[in-house]
Each structure stands twice: as structure tokens, then as C-alpha cells.
């Protein structure tokens, strides 16, 4: 017997089904790839694309929109582009490039997109943040008044660096720029400063050596290594610095201190020049595009010391009464010591000072090869440890006078007593400023060495024995005055009691003759 359906039941059933249907409309702008070459794709039809927007291409490949023209968009592919073809569909995403940030990145080696490349598995819990961000405004900034100890006597005494400062390390190839940066990272082991090391356009073997050295010195646990090797595309080398900065800002925004090293921005500028020329942008001086200054200024301005109010506002009241900082140490490689080239002068004008490393000093065995005459720190003086600031005042003058007199003494046959003493003091100061790699020195030991040379205790020590004397002096104080050394390292203060103790025990050590 056939069942008959009641018309009212049919209408009720249709009504129920209609109510259950979920319609979602997603508006996405689509275009067509018209050409692919050298990592650059030209796309016709993406009328609503935004500057810096992520463009989705086939096989989960993404490109970054950089040129917005009347009928087409020029985008740079992030990753491999061999599989892309003319006629492929390209879609806008409405998002700008983001990278993972968070504490789970510490101790890891990642690429420019934040993907781990160290073979240690996936990252732990992370958030994401855009690679491009507006730097903190004037109102949210605080003055730099806390030091970043590099562990180098010559830097901490003459060219001090403060938390939130931008200090350029500049010099020819093979003058110890990377060595100085890595030693600074190693020196932060017990300071609580988180470090980000961005390797731009370097050999994979060099980066592997750096990671190994950080591991050997127990410094990888507080460091994120962002690697954009020489074999990677210009786009990833260009992006890597901004990605590393975003990872460092995560700590600054939450009331912590971070240090970022860009090694080096010369190669980033070359990568950006390559992208710009391929995008047919008009070249300027040295074939760089017109906005190469903005390339570095918008990156380095993100390094800052931010106020308690900024941190409290960013964390929505979770963190109160703490300031955050991001200290930047950009590295620039010069050609034959020419600091007046385009990119070096740009970065010198953006930063708060520069440490100039000289080939002649390096070859003469004076390492770190810091040229005290043209190296300067514009804001670090106010952040210098009290004891180092008090004792190191005469060091820079002694060195400058020594260099001047040494040049003059080559032409003079006989020298008066004062000049001869200045030359001998200068020789000992120069010798004392030498320091081997991976031998970070504490504040107390730096103060001890500077006090000894400033007060003339090394004047009767042969120049070739100065470093041996220094080593013995540090060991003597460590064995007999451990409490005093700890006190200086913890407080950084200077008073008459410390001076009396220094004087007494240096004289005592000299009488032993055990160096």
C-alpha cells in the first residue's frame, strides 16, 4: 500500500532543510600569473592587493606583494618557485607576513620564516606576530641607563653600550666583527638578556660553527638563531632581519631585555637591491633603490627602551612596573676601510654610535682591533657601570695621545722624559686592551686591570709580560678577595674602601713576583 505524503509535511520538511543550510560567502581577489623569473612573479588582475600583503600561489607557496602597478602586481616568492607556471591562479590573503614568536624559540635555529632547521623537531607553543611593525613612539620610550656588558675591556671602558641602544660594528672582512658580536651574546649568560642572532647571506658552515660555539659556551639556551644563508633567495635574506626583530620585540613588549645582532646589513642591502632591480625599480647611487635608507631606519628604530606604561598597556596589566628593551648591534662590512660608502654612512647616521674595527690593528695582533679614535658611543656613557666610568676616563685619552706621539716619535731622535713616559704608558694600555676570543671578562676584573694601568702599577712591567701579569693579578684577587670581587660584580659601585683594597693587594701581588 503506497504511503501518501501530506503537503503540509512536505513544506515543513523543505523549511527545516532550508534552515539547516549554512551559506558562507568569502570574497577573495584572484589574479593570473603572467611571468615567473628569478623569484619574481608578475600577476595580472589583483586589483585589491595591498603593499606587503601575502599572495597565495599553487602548492602552498606564498609571495610578498612589493610593486603595485596599474594593471599588475610584482611580488617576490618566499621559497622555491620552480613549480610556478604562467597562467597559475594567485589569490590575495588579506594578511601580511607573520612569524612565530615566544620563549619556545630560545635555543633553536630557524629560517627567515621562523621554521626550525636544526633537526630538533617542531617548535613548542608559540604565537605569531607580523614581521613589519611601527617602532615605539617618542612618548613610550625611556632614556638608556642600564649597561649591556660585552665582556671586552676596550668596549666596556671606552665605547659602552646601554640597553635599548643601537651600536654599529663596522669594519673590513676578517677584522673580528662576528667574533665581537658572538662574545657579547656569550657574556649575557647570567644577565637575563635574551639574544637573537640573525645571519644574513652567510655560508651554512659559518652558521654551523657559530651555533656550535654558542652550545660549547652554554649560550644557546638564551639565544634564537635566524639563518638566511647565502644559498637562499634574496627575498628570505631581505625578510630575515625583520623576522629576527619581531622575535626580539616579543621579549621587549613583556618587560624583558633582549639583544639582537644583524650579521650583516650590507648583505641585506645587496639582497634588497637585487629584488628592486628585478622589480624594475629605478636605481640610484651604487644601483641601490631610493628607499634603501628607509630599509634600515625602519628596522633599527624598532630597537628601543620602552617605559613601564608601554609594557603595562601591551600586556593589558599583566606586567607592571617593568621596562623592556631591545638593543641592536648591526654589523656593516666595508670595502678597503671606506666608511664613506652609501650603506655605511646611512647606518652610521641611524645608529647611536659605532665600533670601528681596523685591518691594520688586527694584523698587528691588537685584537679586538678597535680604533678608539673614530669609535664612539653617543648614549652609552649614561648607562656605564659606576666603577668602570670612574676608572676608564683616562684610557681613551692615553690611547689617543699614544697614537699621536708614536707617529711623531718616528721622526724624533731624542725624546724628553714626559713624552717617553707617555709612550711607555700607551704601549702598556694598548697591550692591556688585547683580549682573546671567548674570554669574557667580569666588571670587577675589568676595573682591576684598568685601575692597575691607570695608577702606574704596570709602568715597570715589560710590555710582553703585561697580559701574564694581568692574568696572575686576577687569579690573586679571586683567591684572596673573592668577597670583594663578588661585591663589585653585583653592585658596580666604587668607593674609598674598594680603592684601598685594590691598592693594597696590587702592591702585595707585585712583591710576590709570581707572573
Curated annotation (Swiss-Prot):
It is found in: Cell inner membrane. Keywords: ATP synthesis, ATP-binding, Cell inner membrane, Cell membrane, CF(1), Hydrogen ion transport, Ion transport, Membrane, Nucleotide-binding, Translocase, Transport. One of its GO terms (cellular component) is plasma membrane. It catalyses: ATP + H2O + 4 H(+)(in) = ADP + phosphate + 5 H(+)(out). It is an enzyme of class 7 (translocase). The record marks 375 as: Required for activity. The keyword Phosphoprotein does not apply. GO terms for molecular function: ADP binding; ATP binding; proton-transporting ATP synthase activity, rotational mechanism. Its EC number is 7.1.2.2. Pfam families: ATP-synt_ab, ATP-synt_ab_C, ATP-synt_ab_N. It comes from the Bacteria. ATP binds at residues 171-178. It is a peripheral membrane protein. F-type ATPases have 2 components, CF(1) - the catalytic core - and CF(0) - the membrane proton channel. CF(1) has five subunits: alpha(3), beta(3), gamma(1), delta(1), epsilon(1). CF(0) has three main subunits: a(1), b(2) and c(9-12). The alpha and beta chains form an alternating ring which encloses part of the gamma chain. CF(1) is attached to CF(0) by a central stalk formed by the gamma and epsilon chains, while a peripheral stalk is formed by the delta and b chains. PANTHER family: ATP SYNTHASE SUBUNIT ALPHA, MITOCHONDRIAL (PTHR48082:SF2). Belongs to the ATPase alpha/beta chains family. NCBIfam families: atpA (TIGR00962), PRK13343.1 (NF009884). HAMAP family: ATP_synth_alpha_bact. Produces ATP from ADP in the presence of a proton gradient across the membrane. The alpha chain is a regulatory subunit. This is ATP synthase subunit alpha. It comes from Xylella fastidiosa (strain Temecula1 / ATCC 700964).
Amino acid at each position: 500500500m503506497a504511503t501518501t505524503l501530506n503537503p503540509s509535511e512536505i513544506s515543513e520538511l523543505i523549511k527545516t532543510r532550508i534552515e539547516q543550510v549554512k551559506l558562507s560567502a568569502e570574497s577573495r581577489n584572484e589574479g593570473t600569473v603572467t611571468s615567473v623569473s628569478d623569484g619574481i612573479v608578475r600577476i595580472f588582475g589583483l586589483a585589491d592587493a595591498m603593499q606587503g600583503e601575502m599572495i597565495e600561489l599553487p602548492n602552498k607557496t606564498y609571495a610578498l606583494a612589493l610593486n603595485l602597478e596599474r594593471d599588475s602586481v610584482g611580488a617576490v616568492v618566499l621559497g622555491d618557485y620552480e613549480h610556478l607556471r604562467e597562467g597559475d591562479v594567485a589569490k590575495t590573503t588579506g594578511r601580511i607576513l607573520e612569524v612565530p614568536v615566544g620563549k619556545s624559540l630560545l635555543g633553536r635555529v630557524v629560517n627567515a620564516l621562523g621554521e626550525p632547521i636544526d633537526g630538533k623537531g617542531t617548535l613548542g607553543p608559540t604565537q605569531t606576530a607580523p614581521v613589519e611593525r611601527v617602532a615605539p613612539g617618542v612618548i613610550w620610550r625611556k632614556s638608556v641607563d642600564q649597561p649591556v656588558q660585552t665582556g671586552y675591556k676596550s668596549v666596556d671602558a671606552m665605547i659602552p653600550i646601554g640597553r635599548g641602544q643601537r651600536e654599529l660594528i663596522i669594519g673590513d672582512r676578517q677584522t673580528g666583527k662576528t667574533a665581537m658580536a658572538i662574545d657579547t651574546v656569550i657574556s649575557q649568560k647570567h644577565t637575563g638578556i635574551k639574544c637573537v642572532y640573525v645571519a644574513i647571506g652567510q655560508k651554512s658552515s659559518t652558521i654551523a660553527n657559530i651555533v656550535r660555539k654558542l652550545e660549547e659556551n652554554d649560550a644557546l639556551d638564551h639565544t634564537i638563531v635566524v639563518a638566511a644563508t647565502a644559498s637562499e633567495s634574496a627575498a628570505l635574506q631581505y625578510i630575515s632581519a625583520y623576522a629576527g626583530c619581531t622575535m626580539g620585540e616579543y621579549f621587549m613588549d613583556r618587560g624583558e631585555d633582549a639583544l639582537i645582532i644583524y650579521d650583516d646589513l650590507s648583505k641585506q642591502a645587496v639582497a634588497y637591491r637585487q629584488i628592486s632591480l628585478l622589480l624594475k625599480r629605478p636605481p640610484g647611487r651604487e644601483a641601490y633603490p631610493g628607499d634603501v635608507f628607509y630599509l634600515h631606519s625602519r628596522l633599527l628604530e624598532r630597537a628601543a627602551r620602552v617605559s613601564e606604561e608601554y609594557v603595562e598597556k601591551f600586556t593589558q596589566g599583566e606586567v607592571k612596573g617593568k621596562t623592556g628593551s631591545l638593543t641592536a648591534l648591526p654589523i656593516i662590512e666595508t670595502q678597503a676601510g671606506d666608511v664613506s660608502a652609501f650603506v655605511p654612512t646611512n647606518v652610521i647616521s641611524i645608529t647611536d654610535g659605532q665600533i670601528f674595527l681596523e685591518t691594520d690593528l688586527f694584523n698587528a695582533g691588537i685584537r679586538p682591533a678597535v680604533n678608539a679614535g673614530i669609535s664612539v658611543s653617543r648614549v652609552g656613557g649614561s648607562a656605564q657601570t659606576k666603577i668602570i666610568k670612574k676608572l676608564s676616563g683616562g684610557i681613551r685619552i692615553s690611547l689617543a695621545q699614544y697614537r699621536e706621539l708614536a707617529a711623531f716619535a718616528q721622526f724624533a731622535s731624542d725624546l724628553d722624559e714626559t713624552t717617553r713616559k707617555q709612550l711607555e704608558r700607551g704601549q702598556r694600555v694598548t697591550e692591556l686592551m688585547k683580549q682573546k676570543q671567548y674570554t669574557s671578562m667580569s666588571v670587577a676584573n675589568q676595573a682591576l686591570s684598568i685601575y692597575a694601568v691607570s695608577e702606574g702599577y704596570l709602568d715597570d712591567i715589560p710590555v710582553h709580560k703585561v697580559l701574564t701579569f694581568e692574568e696572575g693579578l686576577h687569579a690573586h684577587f679571586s683567591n684572596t678577595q673573592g668577597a670583594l670581587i663578588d661585591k663589585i660584580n653585583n653592585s658596580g659601585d666604587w668607593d674609598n674602601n674598594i680603592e684601598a683594597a685594590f691598592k693594597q693587594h696590587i702592591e702585595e701581588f707585585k712583591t710576590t713576583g709570581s707572573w
